[in-house]
Structure formats: structure tokens, C-alpha cells
Amino acid sequence: MSRRLARETALQVLFQLEMTGESQDLKSAIHKWADEFAVPEGSIPFAEELAEGTLTHKEVIDENLEKLSEGWSLARMANVDRNLLRLASYEILFRKDIPGRVTINEAIEIAKRYGSEESGKFINGILDKVVESVNKKDEKGNDTLSRD
């Protein structure tokens, strides 16, 4: 299973659903994408989990991103960057089995492939703040970022 390919698949489907405004069944959309772009079967469950988790927690994720992305509203961000930040934030906030640094590195590489020339730096800066805020909350028990 390629986790990066699963992340890319989840990103593509989240992007597509947001851009088209479709309320298509998420799993169907992922399987359709996987069939069309020859995504290995082993990558699909992780892609489904990421996309579903991101959509389930979108309101909390967006709230947290708005707090941490000084000078940038989500609406002002490039569509790819916004959806990639949501996806990576889901991992950081809700998937404690994946180290934050791994998530950030993966997001930067995906941003380089799908985003603009500046996307990698932009994504890195905001996700560093997400990880830092989560770490502060874990250490001090304060409520810098909400997870639910």
C-alpha cells in the first residue's frame, strides 16, 4: 500500500467534490477515481478513511486553520492548498498513530506536485503551527486547538 498515493487520491476526490459541489457518495467517488487512475486496491481503504475523516471533521478543521493561518482566510487560499491543509490537519488532529512531521513532509511533497510554486512553503508554515498547537495542548492540557 502506498500511503502517499492514498493521500493523493483522497485529495483529488475532496478537491473534485468541493469544486463540483456534488454530494456524490464518497466511497463511490474514491473507487471511481481509483479505477480511472489505476490506484492499487491496497491504497483505497486509507484514502477512504482520510477523505471521510476530513469531511466528518471539516468544521473543526476549518475553524482551527482559520485561527492559525494569519492573514489568510480559507476562501482566499488556492483550492488545492485548502484541501491539502484540511487533509493533513485531519491526520495531525485525529490520527495520533501518524507522526506530525511525517504528515507535514507528505503534504509538502504532494503540494509540490499539485499546487503552485509557493504551495510547499505555505503548507509547511501552516501545518507547523497545527503541530505546534497540538503539542502545546498535549503538554499543558490547554485548549489551543479543538479536536471535536
From Swiss-Prot:
The family classification in the record reads: Belongs to the NusB family.
Organism domain of life? Bacteria
Q: Name one GO biological process term.
A: DNA-templated transcription termination
Q: Which GO terms describe its cellular component?
A: cytosol
List keywords of the entry alphabetically.
RNA-binding, Transcription, Transcription antitermination, Transcription regulation
- GO molecular function per UniProt: RNA binding
- Role of this protein: Involved in transcription antitermination. Required for transcription of ribosomal RNA (rRNA) genes. Binds specifically to the boxA antiterminator sequence of the ribosomal RNA (rrn) operons.
Q: Which protein is depicted?
A: Transcription antitermination protein NusB
Which InterPro entries does this UniProt record tie to the protein? NusB-like_sf, NusB_fam, NusB_RsmB_TIM44
HAMAP family linked to this entry: NusB (MF_00073)
Q: Which Gene3D superfamilies match?
A: NusB-like
